[in-house]
């Protein structure tokens, strides 16, 4: 497991949507390249979004096997990057860490390192107003990497991952709780164990799934409103429901997600090799729309000379109305490119 470089908290995108039903309501979309990431190319970074800026922190630079602890802010309206304060000296560089934004602050927790004990449990809070990192309580679930992070209902949540075993536990983070009690266990998740899964949040409801368990892609999919976990349709053609497309093959690990106008987008990742396709989730229908329609535009078609944009371990930003994909890895290639999906625009001929 430690030799595996794929990772999942992050995001990337491609083929345009094919309906899993016969509905043709959704347009194909177009990818637009934005200002390249100003830091070094990397994979396995962590990201969160707040106040109109996307933040990218940490990650892995394969050329020198460097684990990074820098942090950068992308001004979404201005299309430019600004370097923020690095994680403090006492915080290790890391990759495969969980992250979320909450009440105007960003949080990075857990992750993988090169040396024993291999994994981390420390939690760091970033205040953009002061450009200062502050240590919070260690993650109560213990050291791990490849966990899922999200925020709903005024709390942060982190769960699943890998600590030499595959995990399925979740914990809630309360930034206002006294030191020593900021993390509390959350019960009720009946999904499978996994590492490199993901979550996206629509209308303060988290949608959780994807990842892998012992080299098998996990196919269950859940919503969580801060109180109740609800099982949704699997992300595979696992039953006789005719609303599923025969090619309903979304399950993967080390993928990324973002939200645009109440729809969830999942892109790239590792599915028996790196991928470049993307799928859109409609929570009102509990259905996915994906990459089987030739009318849709893969990110690959706008990629530069590296020969294609298939990748895993990327990250994504989302403002709720705009979604971005950046960085990642394919073989020995590490990316610093940034793309935005314009979901309602047709590709130019």
Give the ranges of each region predicted by the language model.
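Sec-dependent bacterial lipoprotein signal peptides
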Residues: 1-19
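Kelch-like beta-propeller repeat domains
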Residues: 20-349
């Amino acid at each position: 497991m430690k030799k595996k470089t794929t990772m999942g908290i992050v995001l990337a995108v491609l083929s345009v949507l094919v309906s899993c039903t016969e509905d043709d309501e959704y347009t194909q979309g177009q990818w637009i390249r934005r200002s390249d990431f100003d830091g070094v190319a990397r994979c396995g970074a962590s990201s969160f979004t707040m106040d109109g800026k996307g933040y990218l922190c940490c990650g892995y630079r394969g050329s020198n096997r460097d684990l990074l602890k820098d942090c950068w802010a992308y001004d979404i309206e201005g299309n430019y990057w600004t370097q923020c304060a690095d994680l403090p000296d006492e915080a290790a560089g890391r990759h495969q860490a969980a992250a979320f934004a909450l009440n105007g602050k960003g949080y990075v927790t857990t992750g993988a390192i090169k040396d024993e004990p291999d994994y981390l449990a420390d939690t760091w809070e970033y205040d953009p107003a002061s450009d200062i990192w502050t240590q919070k309580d260690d993650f109560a679930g213990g050291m791990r990497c490849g966990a899922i992070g999200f925020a709903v209902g005024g709390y942060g949540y982190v769960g699943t991952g890998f600590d030499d075993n595959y995990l399925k536990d979740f914990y809630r983070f309360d930034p206002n709780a006294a030191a020593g009690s900021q993390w509390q266990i959350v019960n009720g998740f009946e999904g499978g164990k996994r590492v490199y899964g993901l979550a996206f949040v629509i209308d303060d409801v988290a949608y959780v799934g994807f990842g892998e368990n012992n080299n098998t892609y996990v196919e269950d999919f859940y919503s969580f409103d801060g109180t109740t976990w609800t099982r949704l349709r699997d992300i595979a053609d696992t039953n006789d429901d005719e609303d599923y497309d025969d090619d309903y093959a979304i399950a993967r690990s080390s993928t990324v997600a973002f939200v645009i106008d109440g729809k969830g987008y999942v892109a790239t990742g590792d599915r028996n090799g790196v991928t470049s396709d993307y799928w859109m989730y409609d929570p009102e229908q509990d259905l996915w729309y994906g990459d089987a329609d030739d009318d849709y535009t893969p990110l690959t078609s706008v990629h530069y000379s590296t020969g294609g944009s298939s990748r895993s371990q990327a990250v994504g930003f989302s403002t709720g109305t705009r979604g971005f994909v950046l960085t990642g890895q394919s073989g020995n290639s590490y990316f610093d490119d940034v793309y935005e999906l314009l979901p309602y625009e047709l590709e130019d001929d």
